[in-house]
C-alpha cells in the first residue's frame, strides 16, 4: 500500500508565532507573513519530487476574513508544486481526519505539532509523527515518532521512511542518527 503524508501548516510547515491576543490571528497579513520551517519545507519538496503522496491538512479560523485565503497564498509562494487538490483545510475545532478523501490506514502519516490532532489520528488507525518546533514538547511526554526542525531532518525522516512502512512503529525518539536510538515497540 502506498503511504500518504498529511502535513499540518501552523507550527509545522510554517512557524508558530507567539501572539499577545487571539485577535492577532484575525488580522490581515498574519498567515501570509509566517516564515516557513525551512528544513521541513525542503523535505516536503523533495518528497513531492520523489512522487510521494503529499497533502496539506491544516485547520483554519472559519470566521476569519483572511485565514483561508492567506494560507493558500502562503502555499502558492512556498510550495507551488503541491496541487490545490492536495490542500485540505478544516474549520478550527473540527477533527482533521473527518475531512480526508478516504478512510485512514496505518500507511497514512500525519505530521503535526498539536498532540490532540495526533491522538485523534492514531485512534483512527493512522501513523503519527509529532513535529518539534522549539515551542512544543517542552515536558517531553509525547510517546511516539518525533521529527525535529533541524539540519538532520532529511536523514531522520528517511530513517522513518525506511523503517516504518513494513509495520508501523508505536514509539521511538531520536535527535540525531549518529546518536543511539531509543525505541519502544
Located regions from the model:
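Short catalytic/ligand-binding loop motif for oxyanion handling, primarily in non-cytosolic enzymes
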Residues: 14-17, 54-56, 63-67, 95-99, ...
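Short amphipathic alpha-helix with an adjacent loop that forms part of the alpha/beta core around
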Residues: 97-104, 145, 150-171
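Non-Sec secretion/translocation targeting segments of pathogen effectors
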Residues: 178-185
Amino acid at each position: 500500500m502506498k503511504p500518504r503524508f498529511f502535513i499540518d501548516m501552523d507550527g509545522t510547515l510554517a512557524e508558530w508565532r507567539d501572539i499577545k491576543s487571539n485577535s492577532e490571528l484575525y488580522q490581515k497579513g498574519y498567515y501570509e507573513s509566517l516564515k516557513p520551517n525551512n528544513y521541513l519545507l525542503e523535505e516536503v519538496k523533495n518528497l513531492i519530487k520523489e512522487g510521494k503522496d503529499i497533502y496539506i491538512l491544516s485547520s483554519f479560523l472559519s470566521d476569519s476574513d483572511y485565514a483561508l485565503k492567506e494560507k493558500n497564498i502562503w502555499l502558492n509562494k512556498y510550495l507551488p508544486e503541491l496541487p490545490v487538490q492536495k490542500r485540505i483545510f478544516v474549520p478550527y475545532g473540527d477533527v482533521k481526519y473527518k475531512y480526508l478523501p478516504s478512510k485512514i490506514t496505518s500507511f497514512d502519516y500525519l505530521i503535526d505539532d498539536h498532540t490532540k490532532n495526533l491522538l485523534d489520528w492514531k485512534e483512527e488507525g493512522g501513523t503519527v509523527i509529532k513535529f518539534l518546533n522549539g515551542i512544543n514538547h517542552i515536558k517531553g511526554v509525547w510517546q511516539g515518532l518525533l521529527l525535529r526542525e533541524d539540519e538532520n531532518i532529511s536523514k531522520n525522516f528517511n530513517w522513518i521512511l525506511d523503517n516504518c512502512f513494513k509495520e508501523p512503529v508505536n514509539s521511538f525518539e531520536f535527535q540525531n542518527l549518529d546518536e543511539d536510538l531509543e525505541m519502544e515497540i
